[in-house]
Amino acid sequence: MPRPTTSSPSQRMLRVAEQVRHALSETLQRGEIIDPLIENTVVSVSEVRMSPDLRVATAFVSPLGAKDTDAVVEALNKHAKFVRGRVSGALRQMKFMPEFRFKLDTSFDNFARINDLLKSPEVARDLDADDDKTKDDRAKDDKDSE
């Protein structure tokens, strides 16, 4: 009987992903990767997702202060095997060392876009109109209860 596939990660996948994220962050923070593109950039690891068999780790990174973020992610992918070797010391308890894949994290950009949208005059006007309507409804309910 085949196992049911779940869309959400298991507790073990989440735990291992967090351990990998910490080890990866420490490696990047120490500046062990010798690449001018990576050395001059602060790389933030926001999330790591593990494959169900724990053999592939997809790290979502945000290169801070880099003009060409895609080039930084490409450089990280180029040095993925080196990173794998450096991280292996911190992850000795794992049976297999995961293969690293780096992807650009766009969640910060999405947050900024949504925040700008919510602060736009059109949305602010609509929100103020909803607040006024809610206050009127409360005042009407208070009158009815007297």
From Swiss-Prot:
One short Pfam family name for this protein? Answer: RBFA
Q: Which GO terms describe its cellular component?
A: cytosol
Kindly state which keywords UniProt assigns to this record, in alphabetical order.
Answer: Cytoplasm, Ribosome biogenesis
Give an example GO biological process. Answer: maturation of SSU-rRNA
The molecular function GO annotations come to: ribosomal small subunit binding
Question: Where does this polypeptide localize?
Answer: Cytoplasm
Q: Which domain of life is it from?
A: Bacteria
Q: Where is this region: Disordered?
A: 125-146
What HAMAP family does the record point to?
A: RbfA (MF_00003)
The record's NCBIfam families line, in alphabetical order, gives:
PRK00521.2-5, rbfA
Designated name of the protein = Ribosome-binding factor A
The scientific name of the source species is Mesorhizobium japonicum (strain LMG 29417 / CECT 9101 / MAFF 303099)
